[in-house]
Amino acid sequence: MATRVQPSVKVLGASFSQEANPFTAAVELTPMPMLITNPRLPDNPIIFANEAFQNLTGYEADEIIGKNCRFLQGPGTDPKHVEIIHSALEAEQSVEIDILNYKKSGEPFWNRLHISPVKTENGELHHFVSSQLDVTLELGKLVELEKERETLSIEKQRSSDQLQYIVEVANVGFWTRDYTTGEISCSAEYRRIFGLTPDEPVNYDKIIDMVVLEDRITLIQRSQESFATGKSFRVEYRITNRLGQVRWVETRAKALLGKSPALLGIVIDVTERKKAEADKALVTREISHRFKNSMAMVQSIANQTLRNATDPQTANELFSERLRALSQAHDMLLREDWTGTTISQICETALAPFNSTFGHRIRTSGPELVVSDRVTVSLSLGLYELATNAVKYGALSNENGTVQFSWDVLERQGERKFHMRWVEDGGPAVERPTRRGFGQRLLYSVLTGELRAKCDINFAPDGLVIDVLAPMTADVFPQLDSLSDTQAEPV
């Protein structure tokens, strides 16, 4: 909307005649809509309207002459614009303004109105001359442009809000470092990662001091290379933030070169991802280790079985049974996420094949003790072999014999000891074997190698008795620290 008020510079002779005055003739013939009003008459009426004005407004001359210009105003006319015009006329000054007027048809149009006072040589106000220009189309385009600008502004704000939401959800921090001053402008997420307060000033020295020394040189070099080449870079490094937390951070940045060089980038906390990668690597190594151990166990079972078997069929049966026992032991560990198993669970699994026939003759007892995964597999196989031998040669080979397997924790000279006992009773007379079988060799391997135990095997006439006494260490008993003192029986 154009509005301009300025002092008058026009002067007209004292006499004024529409018929004779060349000025009036020029106004009549101009294609610009023109009006002349007489401020010396009440209400400053219109005394002249050219044909162009009549064509613009749709009014005839007799509908115009004698009226005040306000007859063009309507319900949409802004009173503020009317007041601007009135004030200029009162001050005998020129004015230019865009005002909403109405044609005879009721159609509104934007009128670019210019009014100038005409004065005599003595400086007395004689007339007002005004020109009109229909600028509806022009202002309409401006309105459309303004609406488009507002729409773009709204869309820009919406996009900004969406970007901010994405940034918050993605936990990405933004930052800009001034190359000259080292000052850093950063987002809230950036401050969270580095443990900074919301209003705390941030600069390059403060941040670089948080970077772990081993990673600091790499970060500095990559930043310098970016300023030298203008290329972007990506680097992962560790920080010890202001809260004392060690975090893994990933930075992606690019130097903006020019009169005001700066480094613009994002930062992401990748601590959890790094932890997951480390856990994955650990699991991979652990799986490889356990696979090798399992293969070694299978190879040992195969060698021992084939070496002592009397014929291929027997060898195949023994080997299959022992592999089933090994498989059951591994299934048990999988259920416990390879964290170890209680001895009660080991007994239940290893002796399961014998329970249906000899369940009432095989008794187990002892506290809830968890042993490591390595001991779980070996002890399961050992118990399976002892029970198998009891069926073939020992207490379970007749109708009356029994087996008692027990374990407990003893207190000796202020140290905890693990005590385990296998007792066969009521079976045939026992004779010391001329050679060690697979079960006995496996049991010795578990006891002396993995439990670091002292083992006493007694082939008494009434039945086999095995006594084991081992130190209690955390690598064999993972829950040793949580074992209550009440579980230890003084001896």
Curated annotation (Swiss-Prot):
CDD domains registered for this protein in UniProt: PAS
Keyword Flavoprotein set for record: yes
GO molecular function, one term: ATP binding
SUPFAM superfamilies in UniProt: PYP-like sensor domain (PAS domain)
Domain PAC as annotated: residue spans: 93-147
InterPro entries listed in its UniProt record: HATPase_C_sf, PAC, PAS, PAS-assoc_C, PAS-like_dom_sf, PAS_fold_3, Sig_transdc_His_kinase_HWE
Modification type S-4a-FMN cysteine: residues: C69
HWE histidine kinase domain: annotated span: 286-368
Known EC number: 2.7.13.3
Broad class of enzyme this protein falls into: transferase
Modified how: FMN binds covalently to cysteine after exposure to blue light and this bond is spontaneously broken in the dark.
Alphabetized UniProt keyword annotations: ATP-binding, Chromophore, Flavoprotein, FMN, Kinase, Nucleotide-binding, Phosphoprotein, Photoreceptor protein, Receptor, Repeat, Sensory transduction, Transferase, Virulence
Enzymatic reactions: ATP + protein L-histidine = ADP + protein N-phospho-L-histidine
Job of this protein: Photosensitive kinase that is involved in increased bacterial virulence upon exposure to light.
NCBIfam families named in the record: sensory_box
Stated name of the protein: Blue-light-activated histidine kinase
